């Protein structure tokens, strides 16, 4: 009976651990209109669950599952300047945002590497520095995130612990 109970507990907790391990912190970089749309499904025609005013501050999000260029937002949204939590609302099917309007920078002063594959042994695509470039997330695999540079010139993998999801400051 104890084994069955432990197995049930592990089965229930495993998805929570998986989301936390594969989550990608980012911030919203949408300047195309007065609001950023958060959708109920991973497609452009999906119903808008909620909006974020683009002129009201900087928003940080935690991204989970990715599907066809759309990231599912996990947990709440944070308005960085006021350090306020914005509760997700308006959907029972999840909250989705397109990868073209979420991004992050690179942490620290040291060189950071974009690689062809999610491995420290993979060939380099580009060496980047913390204040040089904005990156958009495309995929996540374990402790690696696949990114494309804001100008679209480079695509590669980098370690998740090297990203900076704070739009107001550089990360150590």
State where each predicted segment sits.
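Sec/Tat signal peptide C-region and signal peptidase I cleavage site
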Residues: 16-20
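SH3/SH3-like (including bacterial SH3b) beta-barrel domains
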Residues: 40-60, 64, 116-140
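Positively charged n-region of N-terminal signal peptides that target proteins for export
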Residues: 1-4
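Boundary regions of SH3-family modules and the immediately adjacent low-complexity/disordered segments
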Residues: 21-27, 33, 43, 47-50, ...
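Bacterial N-terminal signal peptides
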Residues: 7-15
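Short aromatic-glycine-enriched beta-strand elements
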Residues: 67-72, 142-146
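Short alpha-helical segments in extracytoplasmic peptidoglycan/chitin-binding modules
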Residues: 38, 55, 73-74, 114, ...
């Amino acid at each position: 009976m104890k084994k069955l109970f432990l197995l049930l507990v592990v089965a229930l907790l495993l998805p929570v651990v998986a989301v936390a391990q594969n989550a990608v912190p980012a911030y919203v970089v949408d300047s195309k209109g007065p609001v950023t749309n958060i959708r109920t499904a991973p497609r452009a025609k999906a119903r808008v669950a909620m909006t974020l005013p683009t002129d009201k501050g900087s928003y940080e999000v935690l991204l989970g599952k990715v599907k066809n260029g759309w990231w599912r937002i996990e947990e709440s949204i944070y308005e960085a300047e006021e350090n306020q939590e914005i509760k997700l609302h308006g959907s029972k099917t999840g909250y989705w945002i397109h990868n073209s309007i979420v991004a992050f920078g690179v942490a620290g002063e040291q060189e950071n590497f974009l690689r062809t594959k999610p491995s420290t042994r993979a060939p380099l695509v580009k060496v980047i520095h913390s204040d040089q470039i904005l990156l958009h997330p495309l995929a996540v695999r374990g402790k690696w995130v696949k990114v494309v540079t804001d100008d679209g010139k480079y695509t590669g993998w980098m370690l998740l612990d090297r990203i900076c999801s704070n739009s107001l400051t550089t990360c150590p």
